[in-house]
């Protein structure tokens, strides 16, 4: 059993294997192992610059840490008898650099600020991964929308045929939704990207450390202002989980529709075989399993958010060990989301939309009735509610032909539409879905000309977001270069 250098002074006796296993976060901490090494490097560089550690000790520690960064941590660092990766790395450093040098690394900090910093660094990386995958999904939607600006299909409310629209209009509706997800994730990044390092247990330290310097080395925008806030609060995790839950909920919605569209009684889309399975007994089956699993994954991410909120709701200031159990919820939410996004992008990119069926269904269920009511308002100055009642009654009577519409108009409004010049030919023209779509003039409507412009706008917005994402990655690379330069100046 490994000796616990942290318990050594205050506590006596050995822990049982069950206690060690129960308390250890080592498995989840694999997510932050590399971040921890970088935090240690930045901390040692700062200690040396502030003359809080001698040059020989700094060189021993940095040599060992750079070796871990290049070759990976030795397995001993992940010893499950240790409470966490931070203790594991410290023990490994003491073994590799000696007890004198290794014992100096923790000067001016606590595991509390150390873990909070590592969590923010790893969350930052995973947010960038999510954003990159989200860009790909949005691009797939924009590309398919560009192909289908004139593809007519029915729009639905309450899952009932409602009004004609275009496939581009539908696809760009989801792109807009995912664009807002992008905005939320960018916003979350700004609140993640602040440094707790140097806050120590919660009350800071009496050593003259430079928190701004370590923040700069690690790519943070600035140090957190309140040392208690820095170590005690995980609202950045809750916010990130909330954003991921919203994103996965939006993903679940489009999954649900694509599943429905792929059914034999809708036939709007044929999914690529790679994303489907067949039955073990029914040889004719083609099941949209990938979309179904993706729909289920959204429930898991929502569950991670619920668990996180429940976990932190009663925690007093400042640090509590409960927070250790928060981290796996974040990692799992990222894992489910970041697997789902590229798969959904592929599914949409390879989907075959059944344009003839969509066009045929576009007029089922009197989807064009609204336009006839609008026409009566425009041409004959009939109040909209009256026109609405006329057309609604005609639908109830079974047809929107001239005789029925005229008869209902006489009954409800004491108006003869025939005498005002309405003809059967005019009604047919008004009710044609192509005419209806061209008639749309309001911003954001499915008019094909507007859809072509909307595709360009969406594409520009995506490029702008991609540039912002590139800037975030450049900032992290620049910080890494600054840290490398500082290491070189020590002449290891």
UniProtKB/Swiss-Prot annotation:
GO terms for cellular component: cytosol. Pathway: Amino-acid biosynthesis; L-arginine biosynthesis; L-arginine from L-ornithine and carbamoyl phosphate: step 3/3. Keywords: Amino-acid biosynthesis, Arginine biosynthesis, Cytoplasm, Lyase. Pfam families: ASL_C2 (PF14698), Lyase_1 (PF00206). InterPro entries: Arg_succ_lyase_C, Argininosuccinate_lyase, Fumarase/histidase_N, Fumarate_lyase_fam, Fumarate_lyase_N, L-Aspartase-like. Its EC number is 4.3.2.1. This is Argininosuccinate lyase. It comes from Methanocorpusculum labreanum (strain ATCC 43576 / DSM 4855 / Z).
């Amino acid at each position: 059993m490994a000796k616990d250098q942290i318990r050594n002074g205050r506590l006596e006796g050995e822990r049982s294997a069950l206690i060690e296993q129960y308390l250890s976060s080592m498995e989840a901490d694999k997510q932050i192992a590399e971040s921890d090494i970088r935090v240690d490097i930045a901390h040692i560089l700062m200690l040396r610059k502030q003359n809080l550690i001698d040059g020989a000790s700094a060189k021993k520690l940095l040599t060992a840490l750079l070796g871990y960064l290049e070759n990976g941590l030795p397995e001993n660092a992940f010893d499950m008898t240790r409470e966490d990766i931070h203790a594991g790395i410290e023990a490994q450093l003491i073994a590799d650099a000696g007890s004198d040098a290794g014992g100096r690394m923790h000067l001016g900090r606590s595991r509390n600020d150390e873990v909070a910093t590592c969590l923010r660094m790893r969350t930052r990386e995973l947010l960038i991964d999510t954003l990159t995958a989200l860009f790909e999904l949005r691009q797939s939607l924009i590309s398919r929308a560009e192909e289908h600006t004139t593809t007519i299909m029915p729009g639905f409310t309450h899952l009932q045929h409602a009004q004609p629209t275009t496939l581009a209009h539908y696809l760009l509706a989801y792109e807009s939704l995912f664009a807002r997800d992008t905005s939320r994730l960018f916003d979350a990044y700004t609140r993640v990207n602040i440094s707790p390092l140097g806050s120590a247990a919660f009350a800071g330290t009496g050593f003259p450390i430079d928190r701004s310097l370590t923040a700069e080395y690690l790519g943070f925008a600035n140090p957190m202002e309140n040392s208690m806030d820095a170590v005690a609060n995980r609202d950045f995790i809750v916010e990130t989980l909330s954003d991921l839950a919203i994103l996965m909920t939006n993903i679940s919605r489009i999954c649900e529709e694509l599943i429905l569209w792929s059914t034999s009684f809708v036939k709007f889309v044929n999914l690529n075989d790679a994303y489907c399975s067949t039955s073990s007994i029914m040889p004719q089956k083609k099941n949209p399993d990938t979309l179904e699993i993706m729909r289920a994954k959204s429930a898991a991410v929502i569950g991670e958010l619920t668990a996180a909120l429940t976990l932190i709701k009663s925690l007093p200031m400042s640090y509590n060990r409960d927070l250790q159990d928060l981290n796996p919820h974040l990692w799992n939410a990222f894992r489910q989301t970041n697997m789902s996004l590229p798969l959904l992008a592929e599914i949409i990119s390879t989907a075959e939309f059944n344009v003839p069926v969509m066009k045929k269904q576009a007029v089922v269920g009197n989807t064009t009735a609204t336009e006839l009511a609008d026409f009566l308002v425009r041409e004959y100055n009939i109040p909209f509610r009256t026109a609405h009642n006329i057309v609604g009654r005609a639908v109830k009577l079974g047809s929107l032909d001239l005789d029925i519409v005229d008869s209902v108009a006489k009954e409800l409004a004491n108006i003869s539409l025939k005498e005002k010049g309405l003809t059967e030919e005019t009604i047919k023209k008004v009710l044609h879905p192509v005419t209806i779509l061209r008639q749309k003039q309001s911003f954001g409507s499915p008019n094909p000309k507007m859809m072509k412009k909307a595709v360009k706008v969406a594409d520009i917005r995506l490029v702008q977001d991609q540039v912002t994402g590139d800037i975030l990655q450049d900032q992290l690379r620049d910080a890494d270069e600054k840290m490398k330069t500082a290491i070189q100046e020590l002449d290891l």
